[in-house]
From Swiss-Prot:
Zn(2+) binds at C334, H385, H515. SUPFAM superfamilies: Class II aaRS ABD-related, Class II aaRS and biotin synthetases, TGS-like, ThrRS/AlaRS common domain. It is an enzyme of class 6 (ligase). One of its GO terms (molecular function) is transferase activity. GO terms for cellular component: cytoplasm. It comes from the Bacteria. This is Threonine--tRNA ligase. Binds 1 zinc ion per subunit. Keywords: Aminoacyl-tRNA synthetase, ATP-binding, Cytoplasm, Ligase, Metal-binding, Nucleotide-binding, Protein biosynthesis, RNA-binding, tRNA-binding, Zinc. Catalyzes the attachment of threonine to tRNA(Thr) in a two-step reaction: L-threonine is first activated by ATP to form Thr-AMP and then transferred to the acceptor end of tRNA(Thr). Also edits incorrectly charged L-seryl-tRNA(Thr). It comes from Lacticaseibacillus casei (strain BL23). PANTHER family: THREONINE--TRNA LIGASE 1, THREONINE-TRNA LIGASE. Residues 240-538 are annotated as: Catalytic.
């Protein structure tokens, strides 16, 4: 039977049954054949030199494609397993796969795990295997044959049990692995790889399963790719908020308390407190009423809201109080704010009604997903909900967006994009079941963005279960996209909770609920800022804004303490370093701690009623009158800037008044 193959340009050609991607590619051009590594048939990756199974749309994947790099790294993971099996015959394997920036394989050994010190030996074994350039042979095993092949490996046996029949794999010499993924046709192109690290990972990501050892590596088509990767990893380490948080004593996580439950040290708590006060003041000035609501609620509240049906896997188990009452740690704040709205009969005169809270929430995150402050189990969300009449939606949307842009300006967040997040039309069961609501709300959201003439892109499958949203995607310090802010239209929860207001006509009407987050959770926002600023926070955010150093405690400490008193009275955060250490050591430590201003006082400064000031990152000091320095620092803090000048408010201008 002939194969009808459709190419990306729309042309359809017939090929005999048994044709491979390799044969088709070689028939197109030799230059393409030199770069090709796999195919994609109807969107699924297929091996380069295996027979094409059926007719369909075919793309040739080359070394220039992201999928080509994925195939390279999947092959590297396979060779890693082969090398480990050769070095440690008793080793058991979990799963290995390519990642966005490399590959890994999960392993387990009864006689001691592989350590970081062993990685050079493992890599040499991989390089020796690659040098032999033995053929990678695709194999097909029956379920019985697969059980026999992996009879001594408990984790592979579980994978076989869950797989279909027959089972695909690859063979390299005497090594066979159960492998559904596509690998390179040969090992000759696998020249540039490096093993990187070792970490723990629960089998299949479940904390109830055994902890395996995950060995990480990366691979590229060229040595330059490997060198560039090393530079990126070094840069990532320098920006890593977990490392900076440790060095600047911002936060820590204690395993005796539990993963994903950070402790805020005084320095980190100061940054958080400044941000929280800033946010609250900003929201109150914008018409929000701040509230406090319980972190616990009756489970029925979340059944009514739909969280229990659509979000249960991310919620902690309910607490049975023994008298029929079931309490739940809240995963979101919106049902609580609905209770605030419902506490009184509402009139159209009260709308828009804006409610905000720095609300603590809890999410059932798996241990393997937790990371510093970015992924935690307890978090505090800068949350807000506005209840509006239908004809107020567009103006309120604009008002919220103006507030977000104003906050971004104060934090100097400039690299962001707008994403309209819709439900997945092919997977509607995971969303609230009301097609009319989805059509209307998605249309309103798109209309508001079009009216503002702002560029945006659309993404299906990214909506909340109860409605579409605008996600503002910011670039992290390493160039990755991260959702910072959201605005969501919600027709569902007002319906579920029977929310009403009395209109001008004296009749009851249903409000629209707008969910919005300005900066997300305090935890993730501070992680983001720590990495963007590389720990060198602007003066208004810095835990310690200035450190005062007397040259001689006996002669200059009294003057330094008078300056400190003035600065504290002006609302500044200042410390005195009067330790019995060398001056150079104290100055270097202040720079290491990234304190914005190091202020030195000696005889000359004492006589001139002045101070010598060194800004963080500068190599020189400047003498200033003590009062002038304090006034300039107050102005800098007041205006959220480094130079004390009032900023123009360009972001607000873009969106109008």
């Amino acid at each position: 039977m002939a194969l009808d193959i459709t190419f990306p340009d729309g042309n359809v050609k017939q090929f005999p049954d048994g044709t491979t991607v390799k044969a088709i590619t070689e028939g197109i051009s030799n230059s393409l054949a030199k770069k090709a590594v796999a195919g994609k048939l109807d969107g699924d990756l297929i091996a380069y030199d295996e027979p094409i199974a059926h007719s369909g749309q075919l793309q040739i994947m080359t070394k220039d494609d992201a999928e080509g790099l994925t195939v390279l790294r999947q092959t590297a993971a396979f060779v890693l397993a082969a090398a480990l099996k050769d070095l440690y015959p008793d080793i058991h394997f979990g799963q290995g796969q390519a990642t966005e920036d490399g590959f890994y394989y999960d392993t387990d050994r009864a006689d001691g795990q592989v350590s970081v010190d062993d990685l050079p030996t493992v890599q040499k074994k991989m390089e020796a295997i690659i040098k032999e350039n033995a053929a990678l042979e695709p194999v097909v095993l029956s379920r019985a044959e697969a059980f026999q092949a992996f009879k001594n490996d408990p984790f592979k046996k579980q994978l076989v049990e869950a797989a279909g029949d027959p089972i695909k794999g690859y063979k390299l010499g005497d090594f066979v692995d159960f492998e559904e993924k596509v690998l390179l046709p040969s090992l000759k192109d696998l020249k540039h790889l490096k093993l990187l690290s070792v970490a723990g990972a629960y089998w299949q990501g479940k904390s109830s399963n055994p902890m395996l050892q995950r060995i990480y590596g990366t691979a590229y088509w060229s040595e330059k790719g490997l060198e560039d990767d090393a530079k990126r990893r070094q840069e990532a380490a320098e920006h890593d908020h977990r490392v900076i948080g440790r060095d600047l004593d911002l936060f820590f996580v204690d395993p005796k308390v539990g993963a994903g439950l950070p402790y805020w040290m005084p320095n980190g708590a100061t940054i958080r407190r400044v941000i929280e006060r800033y946010i609250i003041d900003k929201e109150i000035a914008d018409g929000y009423e701040h509230v406090y609501t319980p972190v616990l609620a009756n489970l029925d509240l979340y059944k009514t809201s739909g969280h229990w049906d659509h979000y249960r896997e991310d919620m902690f188990p309910p607490m049975d109080m023994g008298d029929g009452e079931m309490l739940e740690l809240r995963p979101m704040n919106c049902p609580s704010h609905i209770q605030i709205y419902n506490h009184h009969i509402r009139s159209y005169r009260e709308l828009p009604l804006r409610i905000a809270e720095l609300g603590m929430m809890h999410r059932y995150e798996k241990s393997g997903a937790l990371s510093g402050l970015q992924r935690v189990r307890e978090m505090t969300l800068n949350d807000g909900h506005t209840f509006v009449a239908l004809d107020q939606v567009q103006e309120e949307f604009k008002k919220i967006l103006r507030l977000i842009m104003d906050v971004y300006e104060d934090f100097n967040i400039t690299d962001y994009s707008f994403r309209l997040s819709y439900r997945d039309p092919k997977n509607t069961e995971k969303y609230f079941d009301d097609d009319e609501m989805w059509t209307r709300s998605q249309s309103m959201l798109k209309g508001a963005m079009d009216d503002l003439k702002l560029d945006y892109y659309e993404a299906e499958g990214e909506a909340a279960f109860y409605g579409p949203k605008l996600d503002i995607q910011t670039k992290t310090a390493l160039g990755n996209d991260e959702t910072m802010s959201t605005i969501q239209l919600d027709f569902m929860l007002p319906e579920r909770f029977n929310l009403t207001y009395v209109g001008k006509d004296g009749e009851e009407h249903r409000p629209v609920m707008i969910h919005r987050g300005i900066v997300g959770t305090m935890e993730r926002f501070i992680a983001y800022l720590t990495e963007i600023y590389k720990g060198a926070f602007p003066t208004w955010l810095a835990p310690t804004q200035a450190v005062l150093i007397p040259v001689n405690n006996d002669l200059h400490l009294d003057y330094v303490n008078r300056i400190k008193k003035q600065m504290l009275a002006a609302g500044l955060r200042v410390k005195v370093d009067d330790r019995n250490e060398k001056m150079g050591y104290k100055i270097r430590e202040a720079q290491t701690k990234k304190i914005p201003y190091t202020v030195v006082v000696g005889d000359k400064e004492l006589n001139d009623a002045a101070v010598s000031v060194r800004r963080y990152g500068d190599e020189h000091t400047e003498e200033e009158a003590g009062n002038m320095f304090i006034d300039a620092l107050v102005a800098e803090v007041k205006n959220y800037s480094r130079d004390g000048k009032t900023k123009p408010g360009e972001a607000t201008k873009v969106l109008g008044d």
